[in-house]
């Protein structure tokens, strides 16, 4: 029962419209061969979890498999138990002590100090990365700057900026799935960037029977 609650599947029907911090969605869920009365009452078939597979219990090379599974590599390559991982990064604009507000944009390298050791090339004019763009390690996903002055007592001084961008670190192919901009209760804008990545079963993943 406990593992059934943790099973990967479709956790809500509107997951494509949500910006949850982290979400796991099974790409090809299937309904069980046998239904129960409770499953029909709570309409579990609308949010299925798990996949129907053919399981063989056998001795392998003369030794019994204990607490482990062997998968057909061809089935895994064709998408068996493949899942999509959604991860959301959130960034809120704030007002600094000097009264200046943060600006979400692509930094001007000639006027911005404190630039990160990262890739800014994928940032658009809004300070975000276009949807369905591949994100690699040390790419900037949310870019913004804070206006500063070299000398606060000199109003004629050229305004410069300090980088406040966010670097994304990953070791897998990740894409920008959706960008969302809005304002909070204080009137400041905030940005949410939902990222997605495809994953296949690897050593250490846990599986169980739902029957």
For each of these PLM feature ranges, what is it?
Residues 1-211:
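Conduit-forming functional cores of very large proteins
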């Amino acid at each position: 029962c406990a593992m059934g609650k943790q099973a990967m599947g479709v956790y809500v029907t509107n997951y494509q419209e949500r910006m949850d911090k982290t979400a796991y969605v099974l790409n090809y869920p299937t309904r069980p061969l046998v239904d129960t009365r409770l499953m029909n009452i709570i309409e579990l078939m609308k949010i299925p979890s798990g996949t129907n597979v053919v399981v063989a219990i056998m001795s392998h090379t003369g030794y019994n498999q204990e607490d482990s599974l062997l998968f057909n590599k061809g089935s895994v390559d064709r998408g068996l138990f493949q899942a999509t991982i959604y991860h959301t990064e959130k960034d809120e604009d704030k007002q600094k002590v000097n009264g200046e507000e943060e600006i979400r944009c692509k930094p001007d390298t000639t006027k911005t100090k404190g630039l990160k050791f990262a890739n800014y090339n994928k940032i658009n004019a809004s300070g975000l990365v276009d949807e369905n763009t591949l994100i690699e390690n040390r790419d900037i996903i949310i870019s913004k700057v804070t206006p500063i002055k070299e000398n606060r007592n000199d109003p004629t001084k050229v305004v410069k900026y300090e980088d406040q961008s966010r670097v994304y670190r990953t070791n897998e192919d990740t894409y920008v799935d959706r960008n969302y901009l809005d304002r909070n209760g204080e009137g400041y804008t905030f940005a949410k960037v939902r990222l997605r990545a495809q994953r296949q079963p690897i050593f250490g993943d846990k599986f169980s029977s739902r029957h």
